[in-house]
Amino acid sequence: MKELFELQSGIYPRWASCENRTGQKGSAAMAGGGRKGSAYISVQAHSTVTLACEKGTSGIVRRMWMTLSDMSETMLRGLRLKCYWDGDSLPAVNTPLGDFFAMSTGCVYPLHSSLLSSPEGRSFVHFIQMPFRESMRIDLENTTNSNLRELYYDVDYTIGDPLGDEMLYFHAWFNHQNKTVIREDFQILPMIHGQGRFLGLSIGIICDQKRYSDVW
């Protein structure tokens, strides 16, 4: 990683947003005559929208920010974030939006960490770097029966990044069990083949209020 004062030759910043989902240079703020005339998009029930897309170059997704008009448990679990790297037909990330940002019980609360944050519990920020060699696509699927009226977001990434042989792809996996089975292990991570790094996990537990309200 270069120091802040060192020139990054051949690396260019891109910013995908509601008005410029492909992150093209000079293509944002076009809907309102040079102003932010399309600050949000709507996601209809049972539909999928592409939030960011890049082809024909290497790069690194460096930051994602989102906030929604509907922060209900149903919407946070029903919106599904999907990330595809290098043309793969299977998403490397395929998780409910709320769980991806560590809001696993459907409640939004303030969160501050080096990888994820939710300032004041009103928005979601993701700082984990997600590299790609040839292409990337980030989709959001609404699996609920309700329309999401407003989704505000931006995706910051760079293109032209030199990526060595030791580059790792970012993956995220989701598992939900209701109810858990006594004396049966809950699977946190399925069997993984190959090498990688385990960055961490978020677990949300809703206890049996009648039996364990004084324990949890």
Question: What residue ranges belong to the model's regions?
Answer:
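Beta-strand-centric surfaces of beta-sandwich/beta-rich domains
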Residues: M1-W216
